């Protein structure tokens, strides 16, 4: 049995989970998320726990089992606590600022790069060189953070660029010359 799939999901008291067929709706203090899951998986809901049950031991069912449980757990965690990713801008003159709800990055290009805030995503800029992306959907927060990082990924010679907080950037030695 899948080690992830067989874990039971605990539901906090301020979160409600409802199932309509294979569509789950999770509501909590931070917001609401809805997702349709694989029709082969079934859900056993008790007072404050949910268990994902697979019909057979086939390879397809085993692979989907753990994924379904992880996605549902992320939904519960997102509406109760939320998710957050922090990015750092490293480089001379690299800075970020807010323009309304959108993020504007000055990262060495001839023009500022503007990133629009999607529904459910908020940006926070601290000290002009730290950007915090937060929201209820783990997928959405990760995708937006990845898009921001891809504007100017860290380069290996001087380490300049946008990186995740705590990310290790492998450095290379420059040419030695004659």
From Swiss-Prot:
Record keywords: Ribonucleoprotein, Ribosomal protein, RNA-binding, rRNA-binding
Pfam families (UniProt xref): Ribosomal_L6 (PF00347)
Gene Ontology terms: biological process: cytoplasmic translation
InterPro entries xrefs: Ribosomal_uL6-like (IPR000702), Ribosomal_uL6-like_a/b-dom_sf (IPR036789), Ribosomal_uL6_a/b-dom (IPR020040), Ribosomal_uL6_bac-type (IPR019906), Ribosomal_uL6_CS (IPR002358)
GO cellular component: cytosolic large ribosomal subunit
Gene Ontology molecular function terms on file: rRNA binding; structural constituent of ribosome
SS bond partners: none
Presence of the UniProt keyword Membrane in the record: no
Domain of life: Bacteria
UniProt function note: This protein binds to the 23S rRNA, and is important in its secondary structure. It is located near the subunit interface in the base of the L7/L12 stalk, and near the tRNA binding site of the peptidyltransferase center.
Family, similarity comment: Belongs to the universal ribosomal protein uL6 family.
Record note on quaternary structure: Part of the 50S ribosomal subunit.
Protein name: Large ribosomal subunit protein uL6
Species this protein is from: Staphylococcus haemolyticus (strain JCSC1435)
Chain's gene name: rplF
């Amino acid at each position: 049995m899948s080690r992830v799939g067989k874990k039971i999901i605990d539901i906090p008291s301020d979160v409600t989970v409802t199932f309509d067929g294979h569509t789950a709706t999770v509501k909590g203090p931070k917001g609401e998320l809805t997702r349709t899951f694989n029709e082969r998986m079934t859900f056993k809901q008790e007072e404050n726990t949910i268990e994902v049950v697979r019909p057979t031991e086939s390879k397809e069912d085993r692979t989907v089992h753990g994924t379904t449980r992880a996605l549902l757990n992320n939904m519960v965690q997102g509406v109760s606590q939320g998710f957050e990713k922090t990015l750092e801008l490293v480089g001379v003159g690299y800075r970020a600022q807010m323009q309304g709800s959108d993020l504007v990055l000055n990262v060495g290009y001839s023009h500022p790069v503007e990133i629009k805030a999607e529904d459910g995503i908020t940006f926070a800029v601290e000290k002009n060189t730290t950007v915090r992306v937060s929201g209820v959907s783990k997928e959405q927060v990760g995708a937006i953070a990845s898009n921001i990082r891809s504007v100017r990924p860290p380069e290996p010679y001087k380490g300049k660029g946008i990186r995740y907080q705590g990310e290790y950037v492998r450095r290379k030695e420059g040419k030695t010359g004659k």
